[in-house]
C-alpha cells in the first residue's frame, strides 16, 4: 500500500471529454483517502473546465496536446515541470502515449498507474486497467490496487463556476423558459462514429417528450452542429438549440437545469 497522506500528488490524464468526466469519482475518492494531500491534475487544456472548479483538486495543470504542445519538446518540458514541482507521487490513469512519455521523463519518487508498453519500466507498480469494468470503476480500481480500501465518492461530478451559471441562466431567460418548465437535454455527439445513435431516433424521442409536455434542448460543441441539424430536420416539433453556444463549464451549468 502506498501512503498518500501529506503527500504532494500529481494525477495525469490526457484523454477525451467524456473520459475525463469519468475520472471524477477517482478524484473524489483520492481526496477522501488523502485529505491532507496536495493534489494536482494534468489534463488537456481545451477540457480544463471539467475540473477547474473541482473542490477536491488543489491545482490544475494543462497541456494543449493537439495544438501548440503537439510536439516532443513540449511534452519533454512538461515532464521537467513535473520534476521541478517536487511531487512525491505520480498517478497516471491511462496508457496514452503522450502521458506515458511525460511521466517517464518526470523524476518523481513514486510513479504508479497505467502506461504505454514502451514506458512500463518507469512505473512501479505499472497497472493494467481492468477493461471489464465500467470506465469510472476502472479508474477507481487503480486506487484499490494501490491499497485504498474505502472508495468514497458521489458519482460523476462537474463543478461549473459562477460565470458559467450566469451565462446559462441568460440563455434560458432569452429562450423564454420559466423555472417551472420541464426540460430534457440531448447531447448527441461522439468523437467515435460507432458510438453515435441514428439522428432519426433522437428526433423521435425528442418529439415524444415534447408531446408529453417537456421542452427539449440540443447541446453539443461546434463539431456537433451537423449531427444536431440532421436530427432536428427529422423532428415534427421545435426544440431549443444550444449547440456550439457554451464552453464546457457553461454547458455543465446549463445541463444542471435539465430534469433529464
What kind of region is each of these model predictions?
Residues 1-260:
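Catalytic machinery of carbohydrate-active enzymes
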Amino acid at each position: 500500500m502506498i501512503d498518500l497522506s501529506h503527500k504532494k500528488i500529481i494525477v495525469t490524464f490526457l484523454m477525451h471529454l467524456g473520459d475525463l468526466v469519468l475520472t471524477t469519482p477517482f478524484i473524489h475518492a483520492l481526496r477522501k483517502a488523502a485529505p491532507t494531500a496536495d493534489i494536482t491534475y494534468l489534463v488537456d487544456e481545451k477540457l480544463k473546465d471539467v475540473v477547474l472548479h473541482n473542490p477536491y483538486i488543489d491545482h490544475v495543470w494543462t497541456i494543449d496536446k493537439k495544438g501548440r504542445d503537439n510536439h516532443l519538446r513540449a511534452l519533454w518540458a512538461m515532464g521537467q515541470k513535473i520534476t521541478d514541482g517536487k511531487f512525491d507521487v505520480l498517478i497516471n490513469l491511462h496508457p496514452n502515449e503522450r502521458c506515458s512519455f511525460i511521466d517517464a521523463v518526470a523524476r518523481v519518487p513514486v510513479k504508479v498507474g497505467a502506461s504505454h508498453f514502451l514506458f512500463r519500466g518507469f512505473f512501479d507498480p505499472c497497472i493494467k486497467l481492468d477493461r471489464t469494468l465500467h470506465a469510472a470503476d476502472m479508474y477507481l480500481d487503480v486506487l484499490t490496487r494501490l491499497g485504498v480500501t474505502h472508495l468514497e465518492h458521489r458519482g460523476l461530478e462537474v463543478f461549473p463556476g459562477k460565470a458559467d451559471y450566469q451565462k446559462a441562466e441568460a440563455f434560458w431567460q432569452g429562450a423564454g423558459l420559466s423555472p417551472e418548465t420541464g426540460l430534457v437535454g440531448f447531447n448527441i455527439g461522439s468523437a467515435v462514429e460507432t458510438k453515435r445513435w441514428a439522428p432519426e431516433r433522437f428526433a423521435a424521442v425528442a418529439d415524444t417528450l415534447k408531446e408529453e409536455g417537456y421542452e427539449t434542448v440540443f447541446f453539443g460543441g461546434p463539431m456537433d452542429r451537423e449531427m444536431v441539424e440532421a436530427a432536428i430536420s427529422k423532428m415534427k416539433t421545435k426544440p431549443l438549440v444550444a449547440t456550439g453556444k457554451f464552453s464546457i463549464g457553461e454547458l455543465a451549468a446549463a445541463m444542471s437545469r435539465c430534469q433529464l
